[in-house]
């Protein structure tokens, strides 16, 4: 059962569900909360590798996959007044402005905006589930499948999240996992481990 707008407001008021900054009531719609785009983007650079080998990246000593991030990607931060252009065929990572903390008995579902999708913007490539016990900003996996560059601006409404009540509290929520690699994330770093 998904939470309706009234229930979302109650959960926020009781701090059972935490969204920072707290959304105004006009951003809580029916069964979703609108999410805004932050100002951090991770772009994929041109590189000389013939392919990406997840086994190799996963096996780096001490999971030093950060070298992969810095050799093949670059995180940029723009001001609130700047624009970011996503060109056709490009994949870029970005973040929601909001940090979200989900309790152990809820699961979140991220959706892109239909009006943006009609111009070719995919907001999340595959990962739209936000696990029970999650805390942090949500990474967005933008892809422009259209024919023209798409202009993105910090603070624009980029998608929405809904919340579904579980039958009980999870016994293995995300925040209690030993390998919760993205817990409390505030950046777009790619951490490759436990893939193979």
UniProtKB/Swiss-Prot annotation:
Q: Name one GO biological process term.
A: nucleobase-containing small molecule interconversion
The answer, when asked if Hydrolase is one of the entry's keywords, is yes
Q: Which residues form the active site?
A: 141
Q: Which InterPro entries match?
A: dCTP_deaminase, dUTPase-like_sf, dUTPase_trimeric
Q: Keyword Membrane, does the record have it? A: no
Q: Which UniProt keywords apply?
A: Hydrolase, Nucleotide metabolism, Nucleotide-binding
Named in its record, the pathway it takes part in is: Pyrimidine metabolism; dUMP biosynthesis; dUMP from dCTP (dUTP route): step 1/2
Q: Which residues bind dCTP?
A: 113-118, 131, 139-141, 174, 181, 185
Q: Which NCBIfam families match?
A: dCTP_deam
What protein name applies here?
dCTP deaminase
Recorded source organism is Wigglesworthia glossinidia brevipalpis
């Amino acid at each position: 059962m998904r939470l309706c707008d009234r229930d979302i407001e109650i959960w926020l008021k009781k701090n059972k569900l935490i969204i920072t900054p707290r959304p105004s009531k006009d951003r809580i719609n029916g069964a979703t909360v609108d999410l805004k785009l932050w100002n951090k983007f991770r772009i994929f650079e041109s590189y000389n590798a013939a392919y990406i080998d997840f086994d190799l990246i996963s096996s780096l000593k001490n999971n030093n996959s950060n070298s992969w991030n810095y050799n093949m990607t670059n995180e940029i931060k723009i001001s609130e007044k700047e624009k970011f252009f996503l060109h056709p065929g490009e994949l870029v990572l970005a973040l929601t402005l909001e940090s979200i903390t989900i309790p152990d008995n809820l699961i979140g579902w991220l959706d892109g905006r239909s009006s943006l999708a009609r111009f070719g913007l995919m907001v999340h490539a595959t990962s739209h589930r936000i696990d029970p016990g999650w805390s942090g900003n949500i990474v967005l996996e933008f892809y422009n499948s259209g024919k023209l560059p798409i202009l993105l601006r910090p603070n624009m409404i980029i998608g929405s999240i809904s919340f579904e009540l579980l039958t009980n509290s999870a016994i293995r929520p995300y925040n209690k996992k030993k390998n919760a690699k993205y817990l409390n994330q505030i950046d777009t770093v790619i951490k490759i481990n436990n893939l193979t």
